[in-house]
Amino acid sequence: MIKFFRKIRQKLLTEDKFSKYLIYAIGEIILVVIGILIALQINNWNESRKDFAKSKNYLSEIRKDLVGDTIAFNRSIKSISASIDVGEWALNRIHDNTSPIDSLWMSFDGTYWDTSVNDRTFQRVQNVGDSKFTGFESITDEINNYYGITKRRVEYKTSWDEKEVSENQSYMRDLEKYIEIDEYRMNMDGAGTLEKTFSIRQDSLEHVRMMIEFANSTRGRNHFKNNYVRHSRLLNIFKEVKETAAELIIKINKELEQME
């Protein structure tokens, strides 16, 4: 092909047909430019296909992370809801020696929840410098918001929850001055890891009576009320996060199905 055009150019020069040669030269330049543009366009298409394939894979992995988030937050929601129920029971129904000892100990719960948003895949995307999901721009902002705004809200609330628990644990020191820890409490704190437990030396009825007395004291009731507020606030945000993650999963599924 190059030889063919070269022969034409030489013939035009030999025949002293400069005007025709000039037109030919301009046409040749235009063809070269068009060829370069086509090559660049093909290269862009290839890069776009590669970026699309990567984005599709990233979305599939993010969907797995979101499913894990819904499971983790749902587990915490159930646990917090149970603690709220026990707290309500403690505020409304602790009044006599028939109160079960295990429910009494549960009502003094000092657990905090550190459930977090799993951003493993999103961080991998950020680390390679991808600021958007090629071919899936319609949900890019929602994904960025989930791993930005939503994640920070969860971190703030769980950090606050841990701080509240730490600052309000002094009541346990007061309680343990008079009430011996029983087998149930040891097993609860040990989370099933203890090989041995030890019986209490306090009279069982006296043991329960003292716990009820503390639970009905101003300090005890304030503890239950603080726990109720803490649990309720955390429950609300965990429900919001679970709902947001579930909605994002649906949107990702829809986008991936449309691209099949």
List PLM regions with ranges.
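Long, hydrophobic alpha-helical segments that serve as membrane-spanning/inserting helices
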Residues: 1-19, 23, 37, 44-260
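Hydrophobic membrane-insertion alpha-helices, especially the h-region
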Residues: 26-41
